[in-house]
Regions:
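Active-site proximal loop and beta-alpha junction motif in alpha/beta enzyme cores
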Residues: 1-78, 83-237, 246-307
């Protein structure tokens, strides 16, 4: 039976990707399976280190596996900002030899993700490009969403990255700034303060609130986004959410929409690539098997020795 707690005096790392923060632990030989309680405690800013999620680095069958947990301890399919932090951790710890421009395959619950370092750390984190794999979406608004503080019923586009996302477009940045998003999982707040979905996603959903800032004729799209993460609350960034938000905004724009998107989140900026992801040739758009790409920073904050 595996240990459910980190051994005494274990060393962990605090790191972030565009403000999306993580506690990272190396468990190369797969000796440790953390309980939900331990993960939630480590991620608690009051009782632990404080983070949006927990990452365990495990080597299995010649591949590095990113065991990602939400801040409440629940297991998640993937984390786009987390996978950059994960590979940055492997490089800094000397667990892989991965020069700039070379690619590493990373195993996740959401499949293999290919990660390429694009630059070294120059004070604001090293930059990594992630092949996030294909998205899945009905490519239209299929969910009605009510957001506390906004009177209107909003249309949501469902995107699977492969974790679930519902993307809602707002009118302007003032509205985006004024929305209340809780800093904790919605299960911990009154029903009246929670977003409402119809139909309600069975496995829950991340909620992305987006404003399209794209200038007329611009080659790159530009959006501002806030995110309410499933099992966490509002975070400074969400990599898979940025991908979902860019894709949904492109779908709303229609044929001729940009395929490169700048995404501004509270924690910084990332770039999403959608080349070949949307097929506009039919009567309605279709999501192809082409990969979505995510580029952004990974920054180490601290090395911590547990008691």
């Amino acid at each position: 039976m595996k240990n459910t707690q980190l051994p005494a005096h274990s060393r962990v790392v605090k790191a972030h990707g565009a403000g999306n923060s993580f506690v990272v632990a190396t468990d190369q030989y797969d000796d440790y399976d953390p309980s939900e309680v331990e993960v939630a405690t480590l991620c608690s800013p009051a009782f632990g280190i404080g983070a949006d999620g927990f990452i365990r680095a495990v080597e299995r069958d010649g591949l590095w596996f990113m065991d990602y947990r939400n801040a409440d301890g629940s297991k998640a399919e993937m984390c786009g900002n987390g996978v950059r932090v994960f590979v940055d951790h492997l490089r800094r710890e000397g667990l892989v030899d991965l020069p700039v421009g070379q690619t590493l395959d990373v195993a996740t619950r959401g499949g293999i993700k290919r990660v390429t370092p694009e630059s070294e750390d120059e004070g604001q984190g090293a930059s990594y490009r992630v092949d996030m794999g294909p998205a899945a979406s009905p490519a239209r608004e299929t969910i009605e969403v009510r957001v506390p503080g906004i009177d209107a019923v909003l249309g949501g586009i469902w995107v699977d990255m492969p974790n679930p996302h519902t993307v809602v477009e707002l009118a302007d940045e003032e509205t985006l700034r004024g929305v209340f998003l809780p800093p904790v999982d919605v299960s911990q707040i009154p029903q009246a303060q929670r977003p409402f979905y119809d139909p309600a996603p069975q496995a829950g959903t991340n909620l992305e609130l987006v404003v399209d800032l794209t200038e007329p004729g611009a080659e790159r799209g530009h959006i501002a986004m806030r995110v309410l993460e499933r099992g966490v609350g509002e975070t400074q960034a969400c990599g898979t959410g940025c991908c979902a938000a860019a894709l949904a905004t492109a779908l709303r724009r229609g044929p001729g929409a940009p395929t490169q998107w700048v995404v501004d989140i509270p924690g910084g900026r990332v770039i999403v690539g959608l080349d070949g992801v949307i097929d506009w040739s039919g009567e309605s758009p279709r999501i192809t098997d082409a990969s979505v790409f995510l580029t952004g920073p990974a920054t180490r904050v601290a090395e911590i020795r547990l008691p």
